[in-house]
UniProtKB/Swiss-Prot annotation:
PROSITE patterns: RAB (PS51419). A lipid is attached at C223, C224 (S-geranylgeranyl cysteine). Pfam families: Ras. GO terms for cellular component: contractile vacuole; endomembrane system; membrane; pathogen-containing vacuole. It comes from Dictyostelium discoideum (Social amoeba). It is found in: Membrane. It is a lipid-anchor. Residues 194-224 are annotated as: Disordered. This is Ras-related protein Rab-11C.
Length: 224
């Protein structure tokens, strides 16, 4: 039997932002092509993986959906380690979630690697009649902070794949232009190793307060 094709690059992406902006549905739409009308707030972390082709290379994205609720900030801080990309999500119908992008951006730049690539996503573009955040305002913010920007709808799939694929493509081009990176043995995180196939290390994930699986954890009330 032919061997299953291995990913040539494995990129860890963290999805952050306030609770109820739609992070879990963005993750599920991209990795599983699923959408749940009434999702509940993620406890701890959820993650999913998906492989795509970029320049004839197999790129696997390991996407982590971290809890956006304030009481989980201490938990999520550990998950920035090893991330080469980040998606900061706000809800276009919630001005406060957009204002809080600044806090998430500052936290990300404080805790993550210096050269992490960032995309800001304005989710729920299907709710145009309830919009509180003008597209031009968000675009200007993204440009002033030198980050990418797209508006998406996890409900109808608008720009979901495009947002992840653009971020992954930017990461790939950055990584492939550099010398090989070294695996951080202290954290056992898989990081890009230019042009070489990656094989999982033993126990690749850190200890979590909630068990990480590729499906949702036990959840509490509220929307994510």
């Amino acid at each position: 039997m032919p061997q299953e094709e291995e990913a040539e690059y494995l990129f860890k992406i963290v999805i952050i932002g306030d609770s109820a902006v739609g992070k879990s549905n963005l993750l599920n739409r991209f990795t599983r092509n699923e959408f749940t009308e009434k999702t509940k707030a993620t406890i701890g972390v959820d993650f999913g993986t998906k492989s795509i082709e970029i320049d004839n290379k197999t790129i696997t994205a390991q996407c982590w959906d971290t809890a956006g609720q304030e009481r989980f900030r201490a938990v999520t801080s550990g998950y920035y380690r090893g991330a080469v990309g980040a998606m900061i999500v706000y809800d276009i119908t919630s001005k406060i979630s957009f204002k809080n992008v600044t806090r998430w951006l500052n936290e990300l730049r404080e805790m993550a690697e210096q050269d992490i690539l960032i995309m800001m996503v304005g989710n729920k573009s299907d709710l145009e009649m309830s919009r509180e955040v003008p597209t031009k305002e968000a675009q200007a913010f993204a440009e002033s902070n030198k980050i990418s920007f797209l508006e998406t709808s996890a409900l109808n799939s608008t720009n979901v794949n495009q947002s992840f694929e653009r971020l992954l493509t930017d990461i790939y081009h950055l990584v492939s232009s550099k010398k090989p990176m070294v695996v951080d043995d202290t954290q056992n995180w898989l990081v890009p190793n230019q042009g070489k196939k990656l094989t999982p290390l033993s126990d690749p994930a850190p200890q979590l307060t909630a068990n990480t699986t590729s499906t949702h954890q036990e959840k509490k009330s509220g929307c994510c």
